[in-house]
Every structure is written in C-alpha cells, then in structure tokens.
C-alpha cells in the first residue's frame, strides 16, 4: 500500500508530465519545509526528463529565519520549462501570482563532476544567468 507521500508525488508527477492542474496537495507538504523537501526529491526522482539547471528559493534572510532554515532551497529546472523570448505561459483562475526570479543554465559537465563544487569553481559550470518567472 502506498504512503500519502508516494500518492501525492504520483499525482504531482502525472500532472507535471501531462501539463494538468490538480486539486491542492495536503497542507502538511506546504507547512513544513522538511516534508516539502521529501516530496520534491521523490517527485524529481520520478521525472526522467533532461535537467538544464536549478532554481533557488528562499534566498532572502528574513524568509530563511522565518522557516528556521540554514540555507536556501532549490528545485530542478527541466528543459521543457525553459521558454524562448516571445513564448506564452498558460495561467488560470487558480494562479496566485507570478514571481520574478533569477535562473542559471548549468553546463552538462556539472552533472558528471566528481569533485567538490565550491564558490570558487562554480562559475565554470554556469553557461548563462537569466531572468525567469515562477507561476505560483
């Protein structure tokens, strides 16, 4: 029998892959960051699409303190979600807002790197830095 975490991740992955809107997920995954991270990792492990970069979140110090985190958190950016200039994005009545973000397109060598990634060597793995939006 599947756990709530597995059922929720299955629903999210299916919705992502089919580009569908679903009912809200259980609030335990939106109220507690550790639960949200578990769900994110499980969902990302089930999506077998090319990852081209990562999106950082929770980068503001007040937000980090509010959530009692030690560092910002991140999520994968998939190739299918990277749109060229002039493309459109679907929104509906459930859309709460659009947030301006910064994203980094990561070189493929990053994913096969065996060494430690540090602040001094991270720039060699970044192809582009760009503005991006997040539909909330």
Labelled PLM ranges:
Residues 2-136:
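Catalytic-core "active-site belt" of small-molecule-metabolizing enzymes
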